[in-house]
Amino acid sequence: MSGKPAPAHRAVLLEEAVEALAVRPDGIYLDGTFGRGGHSGRILERLGPDGRLIALDRDPEAEAEAARRFGDDERFHFERCSFEMLQQVTDRLGISGRLDGVLLDLGVSSPQLDTPERGFSFMSDGPLDMRMDPESGESAAAWLARANEDEIAWVLKEYGEERFARRIARRIVETRQEMPLERTRQLAELIAEAVPFKERHKHPATRSFQAIRIRVNDELETLPRCLEQIPALLAPGGRLAVISFHSLEDRMVKRFLRDQAEGERLPRGLPVQGDARRGQTLRLVGRAIRAGEAELDQNPRARSAVLRVAERLA
C-alpha cells in the first residue's frame, strides 16, 4: 500500500499543493503530471484503502518510475499520455464528474533537466532533443534545422520573452549553413555569442532554451486544452491545483481560473436574481502561493514556481 521510498528528487511546493487538494481518504484524485511521483506519493499517503489516484505523463521514464514505486498499489493507476487526454482517460475509467482533485505541475522535472541525454539543459552537453516524450514528435535539433529565421525569432520572443530574439535567430540560421546544430552546449555557446550583454545570475541561453522547449512540446497549446476540460470532470467541491514555472503559463492559468470564477455577465434587463452572471464553475481558493525560504534553500529551481487553487461549485 505505501509504495517504495521516494527518490532524492523532491517535488516543488509538495506540501502546499497536496494540502490545497484537501485530500479525502476515500476520494478520487488525478495527477496530470506524474514526473517522478513526488506529489502522487504524498497523495497516496493521505488516501485510505478506498481512495483512488490516476496519474498521467507522456515521459517513458515517468512510466517506469510509476511502475517501480507504485505498481503494486491497487489504488494507483498510471496512463502514459499527455494531460490534454485527461477527459478521454476519465471517461474510459468512468470517473468523469467524480474527481475530488486534479493536480498539474507544469514544466520540466529536475531529473529531466539533470539528464544530459534528454537535451533540456545547457548546463551539461547532450543531444539537442528537449522532447517530453523522446519516442514521438520533432526534436529541438530537427526543428532548428528546418525553421526559418522569422519563425525562430517569433518563438524566442513570444515563448522566451527574449529581447535579442532576432540576433539569436539570425546566428542560428547562419551557423546551420556551415554545420548542423545537434548538441546543447553548441547551441548555448552560439546564443551566448549572439547576446550583446549578459544578465546577472542568468545564463544568456536560459530564455531561448525555455522557448525552444515550449515549442517542441507544444506546451502553451496543450495547457489551455487541458484546463478547459477540468471543471466538468470535478465533483462539486473538487479542487484544482496548478503549479506553473514561468510567466506565460501563470498568466494563462490565472486568466482561466478568473474567467471560470467570474462567469459570463448577463445582458442588462434580463429578469435574474442575485449576481447577473452565468457559467460560473469554480471559485478561487486563497491567493497564489510561492515557495518559502526553506524550500528555496534546498531547491533554487522553486524560485519561479506559483501555485494557484480553485474549487468546483455545486
Curated annotation (Swiss-Prot):
Superkingdom classification of source: Bacteria
TM helices/strands, residue ranges: none
Official protein name in the record: Ribosomal RNA small subunit methyltransferase H
BP-aspect Gene Ontology terms: rRNA base methylation
Compartmental location: Cytoplasm
Entry binding sites for S-adenosyl-L-methionine: 37-39, 57, 83, 105, 112
Family, per entry: Belongs to the methyltransferase superfamily. RsmH family.
Gene Ontology, cellular component aspect: cytoplasm
GO terms of molecular function: rRNA (cytosine-N4-)-methyltransferase activity
Key words of the record: Cytoplasm, Methyltransferase, rRNA processing, S-adenosyl-L-methionine, Transferase
Primary localization class, coarse: cytoplasm
Presence of keyword Cytoplasm: yes
PANTHER family: 12S RRNA N4-METHYLCYTIDINE METHYLTRANSFERASE (PTHR11265:SF0), S-ADENOSYL-METHYLTRANSFERASE MRAW (PTHR11265)
Gene that encodes it: rsmH
Catalyzed reactions: cytidine(1402) in 16S rRNA + S-adenosyl-L-methionine = N(4)-methylcytidine(1402) in 16S rRNA + S-adenosyl-L-homocysteine + H(+)
EC number: 2.1.1.199
Protein source organism: Thioalkalivibrio sulfidiphilus (strain HL-EbGR7)
Biological role stated in the UniProt entry: Specifically methylates the N4 position of cytidine in position 1402 (C1402) of 16S rRNA.
